[in-house]
Amino acid sequence: MKTFSAKPAEVKRDWYVIDATDKVLGRVASEVARRLRGKHKPEFTPHVDTGDYIIIVNAAKLRVTGTKETDKKYYRHSGYPGGIYETTFGKMQQRFPGRALEKAVKGMLPKGPLGYAMIKKLKVYAEAEHPHEAQQPKALEI
């Protein structure tokens, strides 16, 4: 029996919607990364993007455990000397709801062209509405 290798043109992608209300950041991120990569499918092939599209709604209502609301820090740099910026999870959720989830999922995906293609299939929305009703997404419970 030959080893099966999925072809990019043969991959069937489904659309799923996840409600992140009162869900823990890391638990949602790990499951989303697994599904974006396609590891839940029997035809998973490491060098082919076999994952599904994931829509996350109510990202503003995501939570973290313990004191991570104030203690978890995110860093970025402007490129200039002394241009480092830091923000906490709580401030990031207020200013850009959903960005913390995007960063968590992106860190769990492969680096390189394949990972960049996978992260484009993630759609995050702060509120309950999303513009992807035409794709008829299935509800996914985590």
Curated annotation (Swiss-Prot):
It holds the Pfam family Ribosomal_L13. PANTHER family: LARGE RIBOSOMAL SUBUNIT PROTEIN UL13M (PTHR11545:SF2), RIBOSOMAL PROTEIN L13 (PTHR11545). The gene is rplM. One of its GO terms (cellular component) is cytosolic large ribosomal subunit. Keywords: Ribonucleoprotein, Ribosomal protein. One of its GO terms (biological process) is negative regulation of translation. It comes from Cupriavidus pinatubonensis (strain JMP 134 / LMG 1197) (Cupriavidus necator (strain JMP 134)). Disulfide bonds: none annotated. NCBIfam families: rplM_bact. The keyword Ribonucleoprotein applies. The lineage of its organism: Bacteria, Pseudomonadati, Pseudomonadota, Betaproteobacteria, Burkholderiales. InterPro entries: Ribosomal_uL13, Ribosomal_uL13_bac-type, Ribosomal_uL13_sf. Belongs to the universal ribosomal protein uL13 family. This is Large ribosomal subunit protein uL13. Gene3D superfamilies: Ribosomal protein L13. This protein is one of the early assembly proteins of the 50S ribosomal subunit, although it is not seen to bind rRNA by itself. It is important during the early stages of 50S assembly. GO terms for molecular function: mRNA binding; structural constituent of ribosome. Part of the 50S ribosomal subunit. The keyword Ribosomal protein applies. HAMAP family: Ribosomal_uL13.
